[in-house]
């Protein structure tokens, strides 16, 4: 694709090396109907969100291992792919690794830059804002620095929730701690600055103040933490908080990747004080992990299972989990062109279709795709009761 700089994978973190288990066979509901083949260089598609104004899906393509800028792509109503915006690299690390993305009520796009997955775990991850003017992306602002491994991101009301996959930059022994940051949009108001226009001086919005968070749960923005044990696999999956989403009632859902669970967090009216939390499933369903997730209007949670190379849906009311689609790992190019899942990491709902990003952190073989699953005709109310 024009202006798209190719990159290749160099480094994989131990925490993302997979040791799949052979669980009891469960027949999936359906299978992907097609693949959206991405341009050369878009090796590791991940975060997705729907632009509320245009209906286009915005897709994050992180730079992993190599250095350079990263592209956000867009998928239109006919599933055509094109460039959306180029994210500049971190000035110190030389790369940018966008994972979770979401539009705010201000019309701007917020981005979790996971520098840890990109290659630098030393508290270099950031929260970014892609400023939009007249509906078009125009520039990037740095809002937060000091995060270890920013991952899933969601916005509810005036709050931005960001998953912190690990609080310690080192690979630690199990159990490991991870959690969630919460930021107020009001914290990132642009400051007026004096500018000269011809012979006159005036004021115009400048960049917002950059917030640097304290490490190891010391920052007041770090509102919730939990531990991952991965007891069933003897701690092989050292991945904690991952996907994140909220119901229309404001219940926060966080993926506990290694323990194969989803945690429900009940928040006070301020959106950041935790009242209670509980596991909505017991980790014994058909899934082998919980990666990126989305909460549908009915409250069901659709999620990617990276380890199991599958997509599932959970009813948080009763914990029932149903396998939607599943493929063998490391499919060949023919299968991928037909829509096969390939180490999927994120899902996105648009109409009756479920879009699944295949991050493919293992073999990294072309083509690089987003799988499309048709959900029409599936009675999830009956299946999940």
Residue ranges with predicted function:
Residues 253-255, 261, 283-320:
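Loop/turn-rich, solvent-exposed surfaces of beta-rich toroidal or solenoidal domains
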Residues 9-20:
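Bacterial N-terminal signal peptides
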Residues 70-73, 126-128, 178-181, 261-263, ...:
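A short loop-to-beta-strand structural motif that recurs across blades of beta-propeller domains
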Residues 343-385:
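Blade-level signature of beta-propeller repeat domains, shared across WD40, Kelch, NHL, RCC1
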Residues 30-37, 82-88, 138-145, 191-228, ...:
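Beta-propeller fold detector
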Residues 64-69, 117-125, 170-178, 257-258, ...:
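Short, solvent-exposed loop/turn segments at conserved positions within beta-propeller repeat blades
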Residues 40-54, 60, 68-69, 89-109, ...:
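Beta-rich, blade/repeat-based domains predominating
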Residues 75-80, 131-136, 184-188, 266-271, ...:
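Short loop/turn segments that connect beta-strands within beta-propeller blades
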């Amino acid at each position: 694709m024009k202006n798209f700089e190719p990159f290749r994978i160099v480094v994989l973190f131990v925490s993302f090396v997979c040791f799949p288990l052979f669980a009891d066979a469960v027949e999936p509901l359906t299978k992907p109907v097609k693949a959206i083949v991405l341009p050369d260089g878009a090796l590791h598609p991940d975060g997705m969100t729907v632009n509320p104004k245009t209906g286009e899906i915005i897709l994050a393509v992180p730079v992993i291992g190599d250095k350079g800028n990263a592209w956000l792509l867009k998928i239109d109503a006919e599933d055509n792919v094109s460039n959306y915006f180029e994210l500049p690299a971190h000035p110190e690390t030389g790369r940018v690794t966008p994972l979770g993305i979401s539009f705010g009520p201000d019309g701007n796009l917020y981005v979790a830059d996971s520098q840890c997955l990109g290659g630098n775990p030393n508290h270099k991850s950031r929260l970014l804002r892609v400023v939009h003017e007249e509906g078009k992306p125009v520039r990037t602002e740095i809002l937060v620095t000091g995060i270890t491994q920013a991952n899933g991101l969601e916005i509810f009301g005036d709050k931005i929730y960001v998953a912190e996959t690990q609080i310690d930059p080192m690979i630690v022994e199990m159990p490991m701690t991870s959690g969630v940051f919460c930021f107020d949009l009001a914290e990132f108001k642009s400051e007026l600055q004096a500018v000269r226009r011809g012979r006159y001086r005036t004021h115009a919005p400048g960049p917002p103040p950059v917030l640097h968070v304290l490490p190891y749960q010391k920052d007041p923005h770090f509102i919730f933490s939990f531990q991952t044990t991965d007891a069933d696999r003897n701690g092989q999956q050292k991945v904690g908080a991952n996907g994140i989403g909220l119901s229309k009632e404001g219940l926060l859902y966080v993926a506990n990747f290694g323990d194969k669970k989803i945690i429900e967090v009940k928040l006070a009216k301020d959106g950041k004080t935790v009242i209670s939390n509980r596991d909505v499933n017991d980790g014994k369903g058909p899934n082998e992990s919980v990666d990126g997730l989305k909460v549908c209007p009915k409250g069901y949670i659709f999620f990617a299972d990276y380890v199991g190379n599958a997509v599932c849906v959970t009813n948080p009311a009763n914990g029932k989990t149903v396998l939607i689609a599943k493929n063998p790992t490391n499919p060949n190019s023919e299968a991928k062109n037909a829509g096969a899942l390939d180490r999927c990491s994120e899902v996105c709902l648009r109409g009756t279709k479920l879009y699944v990003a295949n991050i493919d952190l293992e073999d990294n073989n072309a083509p690089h795709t987003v799988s499309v699953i048709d959900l029409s005709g599936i009675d999830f109310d009956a299946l999940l009761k």
